[in-house]
Amino acid sequence: MEQSKELDGGTLKLIAAALMLIDHVGAILLPETVILRCIGRLAFPIFAFFIAEGYAHTRSFGRYLLRMAIWAAVSEIPFNLEFGHFFVPGRQNVLWTFCLALLTLRGLDRLRRVPGNIGYAGAALALAAGFAAGELLHVDYGGWGVMTVALFYLCREGRYARCGLLLGMLVLNGLCISSRTVPAFGIAVPIQILAAAALPVIWLYNGRPGVNRRWRWAFYAFYPAHLLVLEGIQALT
């Protein structure tokens, strides 16, 4: 990804966390306030971008995946409580989406090393398997969430990477990922298409982490913690 000198990783993650908080305030406390959900559409692409970047730069894929899986398990009950139950088999939190995305990227990298058409077929198979797993396991954003991370990974470099990323985001979020709609220009427009508006923010990333490695635990912990706080407020009102 081309560097600029605007936002480091810590700042960009704080922006994503704030956007996620706004989104979940809308989802849990103020479901009729559509503008909050519109603003929140920008959060997932930023986190998906960092999963792709994290995979590309991690020194230990196993530890990265294990860390993600542990926090996914910790976050499952707080996520389920949004739907009023401790166990909701038809919905899994977004950290499981990212676990599947990491496995998909691993398979993609391994299989596309094979020379010739077999390598291309293997890469396509890895993507198809990741998509199918996302759909079958009912993770947040489904298979298209897994594909979003893959899109960021595949469009990290290259002359036309940003054009491909923009086109891919418009297709994924405008046509593939389901969301509520709002009337605009006489038609029903899915609010999910606003996720593409996260790209200019992401393109300000300067490639520097910006925070101590120990702070990464705070970003993981924020996800289940803020859900519990919002659900507690909902229970008291």
Q: Where are these predicted regions, by residue range?
A:
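Alpha-helical transmembrane segments and their immediate juxtamembrane cytosolic regions
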Residues: 1-237
